[in-house]
Amino acid sequence: ADEDTNYVVCNFIGLREESKSVLKNYIIYEHDHKYLDSRNPALYNNFIAPKENIVNYDFYKNAKSVICQSTMHKEIVQKNLSLDNIISIGGNLWSEDVLDLLESYSKNPKSKKYSIMNSHIGHKNTIDAVRYCKYKNYDYDLINPCPYEEFLQRLGQNEGFVFFPKTPET
């Protein structure tokens, strides 16, 4: 790695250990919890994992900063890593255009169905959302992976959204 270059590291799951060890002058733009072997702090009391479940500690420690998506996200990372380089952007993730789009979709007529994100990613928990709708006798639509605006449009067609994530979504 060029020592005069600054790096922004986002998804480093596939990054080899030797590559992590040579990186200098980098920040981590954290979207979840890659410091845990499970990547899921919800598995632990108060979101605090046992030390043996902490991974990538030195990579986080050596970062110039670790940028988290929300105050809650930062607090969970801080509880587990006890580092002083963790910050929260605590901002709105949506642009004015997306907020306008959401507002327009919210005004559309709604069916008496509920939307469920149809995801193969386990922590999105599609299975329990479907189970819940069946238990409550709710009609539902499974929304398959699709472009973002189409996903929002599909959400806006139904009465509600059923989502039981297994990890804190930021």
Label every PLM stretch briefly.
Residues 156-168:
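Acidic donor-binding loop of glycosyltransferase active sites
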Residues 1-17, 21-22, 139:
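N-terminal pre-catalytic "stem/leader" segment of glycosyltransferase-like enzymes
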Residues 6-9, 22-50, 67:
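Active-site proximal beta-strand in glycosyltransferases
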Residues 13-15, 34, 72-74:
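Alpha-helix capping/helix-boundary segments
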Residues 72, 92-93:
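Carbohydrate-associated surface elements
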Residues 61-86, 125:
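A short, active-site helix/loop in glycosyltransferases that binds the activated sugar's phosphate group
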Residues 44-66, 75:
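Membrane-proximal helix-turn-helix segments that form the acceptor-binding/catalytic region
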